[in-house]
Curated annotation (Swiss-Prot):
GO cellular component, one term: cytosol
Keywords: Cytoplasm, Hydrolase, Metal-binding, Nuclease, Nucleus
Binding-site list for a divalent metal cation 1: E124, D235
Main location, first listed in the record: cytoplasm
Subcellular location: Cytoplasm; Nucleus
Function: Has both endo- and exonuclease activities. Incises double-stranded DNA without obvious specificity via its endonuclease activity and excises the DNA from the 3'-to 5'-end by its exonuclease activity. May have a role in apoptosis.
Name this protein carries in UniProt: Deoxyribonuclease Tat-D
Binding-site positions, a divalent metal cation 2: E124, H161, H187
EC number(s) on file: 3.1.21.-
Name of one Pfam family that matches: TatD_DNase
Any one GO BP annotation for this protein: DNA catabolic process
InterPro entries linked to this entry: Metal_Hydrolase, TatD-like, TatD-type_Hydrolase
Keyword field contains NAD: no
Amino acid sequence: MASIRQAFVKSLRFYDIGYNATDPVFRGIYHEKLKHPDDFDSIISRAKAVGVEKMMITGDNVENSEEALNLATNYECFTSTVGVHPCQAQCFLRHSEGPEDYLVKLEALANKGKASGKVVAFGEFGLDYDRLHYAPADVQKMYFEEQLKVAVRVQLPLFLHSRNAENDFFAILEKYLPELPKKGVVHSFTGSIDEMRRCIEHGLYVGVNGCSLKTEENLEVVRAIPLEKMLLETDAPWCEVRPSHAGHQFLKTKLPFDSCKKERFKEGCMIRGRNEPCNTYIVAEIVAALKDISLEELSEQIWENSINLLSK
């Protein structure tokens, strides 16, 4: 792998700010069934081979955030987040000891993780009005605001989720941003140019992954994001760049790894349909083409952005 890195990426370095590393598919488990051997460490090796030096593991509830922190503690290349995803907002109401106790546990975990140096952002949290069947809007809004209060007390930058909820999202968020010097990032951004500019005006970074590169309209938004306010991510195992995506036409490089179906697993192969952090390189190559700059220039600026937001 070291020789691949030397030949393939030279001086490039990337920080995948959205890796759902606690998902069982990274252990070979799909829909609760083991389909192939655990290849977790191979995924990390592939990422490092193409210059992905850091990966932030995202948490989406208390239990999952604790698992993310445990992983981050055991791997130097990992950092993590603590938070409750809007689609899991019902966790607060379903908790056997009540929502207040769930918030207490969330804050304690965030403080513990921050003290260890491994938890570098609060989230993933926000609003998702595309999937109200998981949690109604009133519950999402209530616990978006309650979590913002926790984030202010803990003083962590925000790792935010916003889907089809722009006005409510900013109405709640802007009450707390003045108390958060580093602000945060709206990850997996798929909104309009106007919404993107609203993020920038609020001091937020914008996270770009394969889902940000699906349509021509998406590409116009990515072109318009100021480079100094952009971060890159995969949101693996989801949001891979597919041949049907508008951004796919800008790809020039094939990563130096074989791929296989999960049912025909081979050691060292990427699993088809399972996104992973090494594909940060793919996202970066498309964005560099859209921006008409070199991959080296893009890599260095995005790395600087990532460190500015996610380090002490």
